[in-house]
Amino acid sequence: MPSMRVTTDTWPRRAAQEPLLLLLLRSSLMKSASLQALNPNRAMAAMGRSVRVVLDSSVLLDPSGVTAEEEEVVVALRPGAEALLRRLRYSNLRVAICHPEGLPTNESGFLEKTAKLYSFGYMPLTSPSGSNLLNELMLEWSGTNFCFYVTSGVHEGLLSELQNHNWEVIAMGNEDVIKNSGVIHISMLQELLITLATSIKKEIGNSSAFVVGYVMKQSREEDFAKRGAFPIYPSKNDLIFVPLSFELPLASQLQEVDLVLHKITDEIINIDPNSSISFPKGISFSPGMSEIIRFVEEHCDFCVIDPFKNIYPLLDRIQIQEILIRLEGLSAEGRPKLRAPCFLKIESFCGSELQKQLAEAKLSFPLIVKPQVACGVADAHNMALIFKIEEFSNLSVPLPAILQEYIDHGSKIFKFYAIGDKIFHAIKNSMPNASHLKSSSGGKPLTFNSLKTLPVATKEQLLQNEVQDSKLLDINLVEEAAKLLKELLGLTIFGFDVVVQESSGDHVIVDLNYLPSFKEVPDNVAMPAFWDAIKQSYESRKQMTQT
C-alpha cells in the first residue's frame, strides 16, 4: 500500500487538473443516467442533502500491478475494492470514480468499465473552458451536498480548495505525512464505509439517527442490499447501515455503531447434534462472531437485534415443535384448529425399534424426515419423504432426526412474516399431495434439500387442487398466532410457514425461522417496515436497560 504524500512539486499534471474536480463531477453526474436512477428526491428526504462520494483512482487500482510474460501490466482493483464498490452501489450515496488526465489507456478504460458495472459516475480530469466559474460551482456543491473526496495521495492545492468549500477529504495511507490538515485518515480501504457512516451521522447532528452495524453472509447481504435494505445514506427513519468487517478490529467498530443486526446462524462453523437441546453449548462460531458475542456479554447495555439467547431455540427442530405446541390454545369453537405437525424424535433408523416408536406416537406414513439441527450447518436442510418402513434403510438424513406427518395441503403454502408490529403473508406453490409423490417415487424414499430441490407441484396437479386461497386460510387466526409467537420468541423479525390440511382444515405451522428474506413482500412496503422494526426494537431495548 503506497504512502500518502503532500507535495507541491510532484505529479505536476495531476496538480494542475485536480482542482477542476467539482466542475467535472457536476457535468458527469448530470449526464449519468445510472445515477439519475437513484432518485435524488428519495435521497433528500432523510436529511435534506445528498451525499456525494468521489473515489480517486489511487484508492481503487492495485498499485503493485501484475506483470505478465509480455511485460504488460495487468490492471486490477486493490484488495478490498470489489467489496467496497459492491456495497456502495446500493448505499443510496452518489458515487463517482475519477482519475487524472494522462492515465494509461488500459487503466482509464478499466476504470470506465468499472464505473459502468457498478452504475457510478465516471470522469477523466481534462481541461474545461470557463474555469473562472470553478469557485462558484464549488460553493454551490458544498451548499447543497455533503461531499467526500477519497484518495491515497493529497495535493496541497487541491486539499486547500476542497476544505475551503466544506468537502471532507478521506486519505488512505500514512497519517504522519499530513498533520493538522483536517484530513480524515484511514489505514485500509475496509475502513472507508464505517468512516462514511460515522461522518454522515455527525453531519446530521440528529439524536434520532443511529448507525446499524450488520453481520451476515455475503449472499444474504447482497440480496437485502439490492432491495435497498442497507443504505449508508440515512433511511427515512434515520438509520445508517454499515457492514462490520472481520478484517478490522471489531472492538473499535462496535464502539462506533449504536446496535448490531445479525444473522448469527450464518457464522456457525459446526454444531454438535448431541448438544442441540442445550444450545449454545456445542456450537462453534467463526472467530469474528465469537468476538462479537464476547463483546455483547461484557457490555450488557449494548443492543443486538436480536438477543442471541432468543435465537438459539430456532436451531433445534424439537424446540421449535415445543414452541408451536403452545399456540394450540388459540383454537376455539367455530374456528379452524391451529397446531404443530405430529412428530417423533429418533436416534436411529433401526426398523424394529422404529416400528414400535411410530405406533406409540400414532404416526402413519407418509412421513417427512428432517435433521434435528434446523440451520447453520450444510446438511440441516437435507430431508426425505418416506412411504414405508423399509425405506429407512440406508437413509442419508443426519441423526438425530425428527419424523413429521406429511400433510396433504393442496400444494399451497402460506408464508408469514412478522416484521416488528407488522405482519405480511404470501402464497406460494408447494409440494404435491402424497399420492402424486408416491406414484413418482419409484418405490424409493424421495430425498431433497428444502432450500434447493424441494419438489413442487406441476401445473396439472395445481389445477386438480384448485381452491380459492382466501377460503382456505383464516388470516385472523394466523395473525393472532404471529403476535403470540412474537411474545414467546422475543424476536423482532421472524417468519413461519402454514399449510391447511385438506381433510380437516387444520392450520399447521410447519416451519419457523429468524430474519427471513421476506422476498415475497414488495420492497416499497417491506423496507420501511424493516427499518421501523429495527428502530423500534432498539429504542425499546434501550429503555429497558435504562430502567
UniProtKB/Swiss-Prot annotation:
InterPro entries: Inositol_tetrakis-P_1-kinase, InsP(3)kin_ATP-grasp
Catalytic activity: 1D-myo-inositol 3,4,5,6-tetrakisphosphate + ATP = 1D-myo-inositol 1,3,4,5,6-pentakisphosphate + ADP + H(+); 1D-myo-inositol 1,3,4-trisphosphate + ATP = 1D-myo-inositol 1,3,4,5-tetrakisphosphate + ADP + H(+); 1D-myo-inositol 1,3,4-trisphosphate + ATP = 1D-myo-inositol 1,3,4,6-tetrakisphosphate + ADP + H(+)
Domain ATP-grasp: 327-539
Coiled-coil ranges from the UniProt annotation: none
Example of a GO biological process term: inositol trisphosphate metabolic process
One Gene Ontology term of the molecular function aspect: inositol-3,4,5,6-tetrakisphosphate 1-kinase activity
Amino-acid positions noted as binding 1D-myo-inositol 1,3,4-trisphosphate in the UniProt annotation, renumbered to this chain: K263, H381, K415, N513, S517
Tissue: Highly expressed in embryos and at lower levels in roots, leaves, flowers and anthers.
Residue sites binding ATP per the record: 317, 370, 404-415, 430, 450
Cofactor: Mg(2+)
Binding site for Mg(2+) 2: D511, N513
Paired cysteines (S-S): none
Keyword Protein transport: no
Cofactor mode of binding and number, as noted: Binds 2 magnesium ions per subunit.
Enzyme class name: transferase
Induction of synthesis: By drought stress.
Record function comment: Kinase that can phosphorylate various inositol polyphosphate such as Ins(3,4,5,6)P4 or Ins(1,3,4)P3 and participates in phytic acid biosynthesis in developing seeds. Phytic acid is the primary storage form of phosphorus in cereal grains and other plant seeds.
Family statement: Belongs to the ITPK1 family.
Subunit text: Monomer.
Protein name per its UniProtKB record: Inositol-tetrakisphosphate 1-kinase 6
Organism: Oryza sativa subsp. japonica (Rice)
